[in-house]
Amino acid sequence: MRTPLFVAMFVLSIFATPIAHADDAWMQSQRQWREQRAEALSQPDGWLSLVGLHWLAPGRHSVGKAADRDIVLSAGPDALGELELSEQDGVDRVRWYPPKDVVALRYNDAPVGTESIEVGADSSDHPGVITWSGGSVQLIERGGKLGLRVRDAEAPTRTHFQGLAWFEPDQRWEIKARFEAKPAGSTIPIANVLGQLEATPNPGRVVFEIDGNHYTLEALGDPAESLFLIVADRSNGKQTYGAGRFLYTDAVVGGEVMLDFNRMVNPPCAYNAYSTCPLPPPENRLNLAVEAGEKTYQGAH
């Protein structure tokens, strides 16, 4: 005859097992996500491959790795041709004149001849990237300034990459938040590491609770796809990167969104000196230490 104690233990075993499996699955999901994060960073065109940033002045400039170029790159062919920055109808435009001695260059993955090409900045509808074997130059626009972002697959920051440091995943840092939408067209001033300030679309804010305390974060991005949060907290400059961290979410559903601080990551500036990272707005400085997500990067940068 089975005793009540036996029955109780049997029932508990049935219900305990799925919970343990769920925790195991959650932990595995976190580890897999972190592996994917490191893999993305270390791709040939990832943030670890940045080796230069050159701001353009008006006029026509020779570009390449050779020392006699007007703009000397740290990677790529000796002669990359010429780039001309001019104003047309009140708009700054950049035209690329490929070198006459054609090397294996491509523009947006298409072969390049000797005809000039208008290069689109990363903020335009038709961004352009000049590539060669193992590297690239991309035109970027920041605060009305145009510059060349240079990548090299053999950059020491990439080839010597030793991985990322993380806090141990903790489900307590996976928090459901309420999304409070703002009127269409709302913006918030966002500063970047260059000292520029730009009015950035601000669709709303997230409201959440930790240990009985209420917090809010101003959100960027598209609620129908993913919110982008630039966050500072009291761990910055200690266990985590001094200039704050980024957090991306899934889409807002039914006025709610999940904030998984275990997936808070460092901005690109944590890995190299050539990024133009946005900084947390004053509204997003949390008065607590978020001991979750990515820690301070220990590699060369």
Predicted regions mapped to residue ranges:
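An exposed acidic His-Trp-rich patch
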Residues: 109-123, 214-263
